[in-house]
């Protein structure tokens, strides 16, 4: 359980959507992060994969602000302390807003995957996962923005999928977090994307899986990685 509480973009700090505080405030600060109604700090499971809640978390609404990022620039997402039992992949997507991200219809966003990390080492099941590397990096994850994509406004969809109960159908726990970015530069690629409600199904091999057995490999969920 957890959420992104701070974001560092090209060395500049931006506050996250503090779901443990902001829903209870009459006038919460405007941020680049999307708001959610997940005040339990919880997740979306397979029963929500074909609903809008999987896109940017439960009841998500666009952040009012947008942060500039240079092509090849870095976005560091700083989480609340992540439970070490919650092993799983960390996946990052971008979707063009085709306009202002603060007013975008999330159900129309088409995401392409820009980074993925899954099972690192399975010598001693459940093994070492991307989530463990996130914990080791002081509960943070850094994603690099591709240099090849066309400039414009994008939603970054950053996600941990916790697999500690994934041996049961709908046992995997998705924690998507979205932020608004304005990518600058001279790229020209407009990669094909996938609607958020089509990213996952609850029987995908990387979603319905027992991580407490020896795994020869792990198939990271979602569409193929964009490599530029």
Curated annotation (Swiss-Prot):
The UniProt record lists the EC number as 1.14.99.56
Function of this protein? Lytic polysaccharide monooxygenase (LPMO) that depolymerizes crystalline and amorphous polysaccharides via the oxidation of scissile alpha- or beta-(1-4)-glycosidic bonds, yielding C1 and C4 oxidation product. Catalysis by LPMOs requires the reduction of the active-site copper from Cu(II) to Cu(I) by a reducing agent and H(2)O(2) or O(2) as a cosubstrate. Is able to cleave cellulose and xylan to produce C1- and C4-oxidized products.
**Can you tell me which residues bind O2?**
164, 173
| InterPro entries per the UniProt record, alphabetical | AA9 (IPR049892), AA9_LPMO (IPR005103)
A GO molecular function term, named singly, is:
cellulase activity
Q: What cystine linkages occur within this chain?
A: 56-178, 97-101
Family named by the database record: Belongs to the polysaccharide monooxygenase AA9 family.
Q: Name one GO cellular component term.
A: extracellular region
Tell me what reaction this enzyme catalyses: [(1->4)-beta-D-glucosyl]n+m + reduced acceptor + O2 = 4-dehydro-beta-D-glucosyl-[(1->4)-beta-D-glucosyl]n-1 + [(1->4)-beta-D-glucosyl]m + acceptor + H2O
The protein's UniProt keywords, in alphabetical order, are: Carbohydrate metabolism, Cellulose degradation, Copper, Disulfide bond, Glycoprotein, Metal-binding, Methylation, Monooxygenase, Oxidoreductase, Polysaccharide degradation, Secreted
Q: Where on this chain does Cu(2+) bind?
A: 1, 86, 175
The cofactors it requires, by name, are: Cu(2+)
Cellular localization per UniProt: Secreted
Q: Spell out how it gets used.
A: Lignocellulose is the most abundant polymeric composite on Earth and is a recalcitrant but promising renewable substrate for industrial biotechnology applications. Together with cellobiose dehydrogenases (CDHs) an enzymatic system capable of oxidative cellulose cleavage is formed, which increases the efficiency of cellulases and put LPMOs at focus of biofuel research.
Glycan attachment sites: 138
Name of the top EC class for this enzyme? oxidoreductase
Per UniProt, activity regulation is: Small amounts of H(2)O(2) boost LPMO activity, while higher amounts lead to inactivation of the enzyme.
Q: Residue positions of the PTM Methylhistidine?
A: 1
**Cofactor comment:** Binds 1 copper ion per subunit.
Give the protein's recorded name.
AA9 family lytic polysaccharide monooxygenase A
């Amino acid at each position: 359980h957890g959420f992104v509480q701070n974001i560092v973009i090209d060395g500049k700090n931006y506050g996250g959507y503090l779901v443990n505080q902001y829903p209870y405030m009459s006038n919460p600060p405007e941020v680049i992060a999307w708001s959610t109604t997940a005040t339990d700090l919880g997740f979306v499971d397979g029963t929500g994969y074909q609903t809008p809640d999987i896109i940017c978390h439960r009841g998500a609404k666009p952040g009012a602000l947008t942060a500039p990022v240079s092509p090849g620039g870095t976005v560091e997402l700083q989480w609340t302390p992540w439970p070490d039992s919650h092993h799983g992949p960390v996946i990052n997507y971008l979707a063009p807003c085709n306009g202002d991200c603060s007013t975008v219809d999330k159900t129309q966003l088409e995401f392409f995957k820009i980074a993925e990390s899954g099972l690192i080492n399975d010598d001693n099941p459940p093994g070492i996962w991307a989530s463990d590397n996130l914990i080791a990096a002081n509960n943070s994850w850094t994603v690099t923005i591709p240099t090849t994509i066309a400039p414009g406004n994008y939603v970054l969809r950053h996600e941990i999928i916790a697999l500690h109960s994934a041996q049961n159908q709908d046992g995997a726990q998705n924690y998507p977090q979205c932020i608004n970015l304005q990518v600058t530069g001279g790229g020209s690629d407009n990669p094909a994307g996938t609607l958020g409600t089509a990213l996952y199904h609850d029987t995908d091999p990387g979603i319905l899986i027992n991580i407490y057995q020896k795994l020869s490999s792990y198939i990271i969920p979602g569409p193929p990685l964009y490599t530029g």
